Amino acid sequence: MSDTENTNLTPAPAAEKTLGMRKNGKQWHAPKKAFRPTSGLKSYEKRSQERAIMIQVKAKEKEMKEEKEEERQRKVQAIKEKRAKKEEKERYEKMAEKMHKKRVERLKRKEKRNKLINS
């Protein structure tokens, strides 16, 4: 009797959960596991650090875009000024063909005064 008591007292090895036959008959497929999204795995500190880094990156990108746009606007303005100067020169040359040289000079001075007053 003591032999049977000793066998009953020893704990059985941990019962492994054995998977039986699959109900749908597709035994060649790997068994499915519970869906665990990765969104909950990051800590709050890590997410806040990533947000801070993203804010810095966005600010740097915005600054670079503004610099690029400013450079483009400066080039456009220079081209416009150059064209305006060229048009004005051509206009004075046309006037010089028709009028006396001194009169054209007087008109130039008069127009420059008007530009300064109007602007």
UniProtKB/Swiss-Prot annotation:
Subcellular location: Nucleus, Nucleolus
GO CC field: nucleolus
Cross-referenced Pfam families: Cgr1 (PF03879)
Compositionally biased intervals (Polar residues): 1-10
A biological process from GO: rRNA processing
Coiled-coil spans in chain: 49-106
Predominant localisation class: nucleus
Composition bias, Basic residues: 23-35, 99-119
Region (Disordered): 1-46, 60-119
Compositionally skewed regions (Basic and acidic residues) per UniProt: 60-98
Keywords (A to Z) from UniProt: Coiled coil, Nucleus, Ribosome biogenesis, rRNA processing
Superkingdom classification of source: Eukaryota
InterPro entries with a match to the protein in the record: Cgr1-like
Membership in a protein family: Belongs to the CGR1 family.
Function of the molecule: Involved in nucleolar integrity and required for processing of the pre-rRNA for the 60S ribosome subunit.
Protein name per the record: rRNA-processing protein CGR1
Organism: Gibberella zeae (strain ATCC MYA-4620 / CBS 123657 / FGSC 9075 / NRRL 31084 / PH-1) (Wheat head blight fungus)
Lineage, broadest ranks: Eukaryota, Fungi, Dikarya, Ascomycota, Pezizomycotina
